Amino acid sequence: MLVLYNVVMEITERQKEILCQIIEEYAETASPVGSVTMAKLFGVSPATIRAEMARLEALGLIAQPHTSAGRVPTDAGYRFYVNNLENGAMTFEKSEVARKSFERGTHAIEVRIASQSQADAAIRRAVDSLVELTGNLGLATIGGQLYLSGISQLFTQPEFMDTRRVQAVAKLLDNLEPWLREAAPGEPLNIFIGQENPIGKNSEVSLIISKFRSPFSDRSYIGVLGPTRQNYSRVMSLVRYTGNMLEEIL
């Protein structure tokens, strides 16, 4: 996992808020985020935003693609954001639209899983639901069995226009089940961002998995794999909820 001790000590509250907005804007648009866009959101001048962006870039949290004047989050930026989501140090206003979208998602998961009397069908429905709700590849492992869904959907994301990235993801998937079996990530929710993926450091994807108990294995996992450009707050919540639902019904 990326170490961010210096960042925690040096970043200001406004810089945290700007980083959050860059991450959320980039997740929606897949386009580098410029200072003019941020200036409108924060009600300050573009020059002020450019100065704050320069500081975030110096801290390694955002970067400037060669072909754009805007900025994109780095793996370290995503890690800082996710860490603060998990420990509650960074709280953001959720729009009514976002709240209702999440509630519809959890309801859809509950209905689809709870209606299944057989474990295999429930797991497949859970994986399919995560694919539909997040646009990522959905996966689950129970013992030595791996469930996958949504590979074609994953590769429609703009990040995977590059065949090199597709090949890196394919290699990661080939080794995913053996790695989960051996490494057995122990947290209820595990997030591996970009270079943190031990079996796919160059794949530029994030793996978000929830560990859950089942009658078949005490090391069962369900989650998603997708580009590092994610709506982490929503996806993490949906993955955690799905794992909890499977624990209840299996």
Regions found by a protein language model. Give the residues of each.
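Short, leucine-enriched amphipathic alpha-helices that occur as contiguous helical runs
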Residues: 11, 15-19
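N-terminal helix-turn-helix
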Residues: 21-28, 32-84
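Intrinsically disordered, acidic Ser/Thr/Pro-rich low-complexity regulatory segments
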Residues: 79, 86-250
